[in-house]
Amino acid sequence: MESTDSSPPLSMTDTEKKGDAVTTVTDESSVSEYERFLHLENVFSGASRKKLLRKLDLRLLPTLSFLYLMCSLDKSNAGNAKLFGLLEDLGMSGTQYNLALMYFFFTYGLSEPVSNIMLRRVGPKIWFPFIVCAWGLITTLTSQASSYAGFVVIRLMLGITEAGLYPGAYFILSMWYTPKEIGTRMAIFYGANTTAGAFGGVIAYGVGSLDGNLGWRAWRWLFLIEGCITIFAGLACLFCLPAFPHQYQAGKGTKWLTDEELEYASLRVKYANGPVSSTYTFRWSDVVAAAKDRKTYFMMMLFWWGGSVPTYSLSYTLPTMVANLGYTAVKAQVMTTPPYIFATCVCVAVGYISDQTQRRYLCIMGAYTLGLIGIIILWITVHHPSIPGVSYFAIFLAAAGYSAQAPIVGAWTASNITNPSKRAAAIGLLMLLGSVGGGSIGSNIYISSEAPTYPLGFGFSVGATVLGAMIPATIHWFLMRKENKRRGGLDVAEIERKYTTEELGEMGEDSPLFRFVL
C-alpha cells in the first residue's frame, strides 16, 4: 500500500539537512522562517516536545471538550424531555416533534460555514464566548416554552447559535496540531459528544426527581439547568480558550507558553508538509476554492450519510428505543449511559490508531462496519422481545461505530487541505450538508407509529451507510492514491525549475510536491 505521509519530497539544491531529507527554500524571508523552524525542531525534541504537547492538550482539549459536551446536551436534550411530558404539555404530536427537531438543523447547517469564516477572521477568544453564551441563554428560554410554535422558534434560534462550535473546534485543533497528531485530539474532542449521551441520561434521571417542584415539569428544569451551566462555560472561555497561535504578537504571547514554545507551536503546523507553506492571510478566494474542490464534496457524503443520518437518529431515538425494551421512562434514561461510555472509549482508540498508522480510510471503514453490524443486529432483534439483552448489546456497537467515524472524517479533511482559510471553509461546508441533510433526515426516519421495529429507520440507516458513505469513501481514497502515485513519478528537479517557492505555496495540496494522507 502507498505511504500516507503527507510530507512532500524535498528539494535537492541549496540544501539543509532535516533528518534524512534534504530541503530547499528559495525565498529569503522563507529561508529565515523555515531555518528558524528547523532550529526549533532540534530544540524541541524528545521530552521538550512531549512537554509542549501536554501543555497544548491541557489547555485546548478540556475546554473544547466541555463546550462540546454542553452543545451536545443542549442539542439532544429534547429526546430526554420527550419522556418527561414535553409533547403533552405543549400539545405536540409525534410528527410535530420530529419536524421541530428537523427545523433546528436547517439554521444549524446553514450557519456552520458562516460561523467558521467569522472564527477565522476574529479568532476563538472573541467568537466562541459569544456563541456559547448565546446558545446557553436560548436553552434556558426553552424552559419557558408554552406552545408548539414557540418551541419551533426557539429551536431555530438554537441552531444559529450552536452551529459554530463543532466545525470551529475542528478548525482550532487544526491550527495547533500537525496532521500526525490531530486524529487523536479530534477523537478526544468528539468523545465529549458520546459522553454527553452518557451524562445526558444521568442528568435527566436526576432532574426527573424535580418533577412538580415550584409547579414545573421535569423537562422545564432540564432546559433551565443545562442552559445556566452553558452560560457559565461561555464566560469561562474568555479566560481559558487561547487565540490562534499566529495571532499572538512577538514578546506579547501567553502566560501558559514561553515565547519559544509559542513560536514553535505556530511554525510546526505551518511547515508540517515541508518548506513550502500556505498563506495565513484570510482571502475570500480560498473560501471559493473550498466550494469548488472535489475533496469537499466527497467528505460531505461521508459526514452526511455515514455520520449525521445514523448518529442523529440514534441520539434522538435511543431513550425511546431503550424504553421499548421494557424499561420505565426514568430507568431508560440511565440505561442509555453505558453504550455512550463504550462509544467514547472506542472513539478515542480509533483516533489514536489513525494517527499512529496514518491510515484514515481504513479506520473510517472499520468504524462504519462496526456501526453497520450494530444496526443490523438491532433491526433483527427488535422483532424478538424475548431477547432484549441482544438488542441492548447491538446498541453498544451502533453507538461506538457511528461515533468513531466522525473525528476521523474531520482529521482526513484537515490533513489534506493546507491553506487555513480554505480548510476552515471546507470544514464548515461539509458540516453544512451533514447537519441539514443528516439532521433533518435522521430526526424523521424513526417514526413513532412504527415503534418498536422501525422498519424505515433501520433500513434507511443501513442503506445510507453502505451507498452514501462506504462507497464514496472508497472512491475518494482510490483517487487520492492514484494522484499520489502520479506525483511520485514526477521529476522533483524539474518541478523546482518550473515553479517558485511562492507558487508552490499558493498551490497548497495541489502542489506536485504534496502527498495526500490516505
Curated annotation (Swiss-Prot):
Q: Does the keyword Transmembrane helix apply?
A: yes
Which PROSITE patterns would you find in this protein's record? MFS
Which Gene3D superfamilies does its entry note?
MFS general substrate transporter like domains
Q: What keywords were assigned to this record?
A: Cell membrane, Glycoprotein, Membrane, Transmembrane, Transmembrane helix, Transport
What family does this chain come from, according to its entry? Belongs to the major facilitator superfamily.
Topology in membrane? Multi-pass membrane protein
Membrane-spanning residues: 99-119, 122-142, 156-176, 187-207, 221-241, 298-318, 334-354, 362-382, 392-412, 427-447, 455-475
- Biased composition (Polar residues) is annotated at 1-13
- From the Swiss-Prot or TrEMBL record, state where the protein is found: Cell membrane
Named from the GO MF annotations, one term is: transmembrane transporter activity
Q: Which organism is it from?
A: Penicillium expansum
Q: In its keyword annotation, does this UniProt entry include Transmembrane?
A: yes
Q: This chain belongs to which protein, by name?
A: MFS-type transporter cnsO
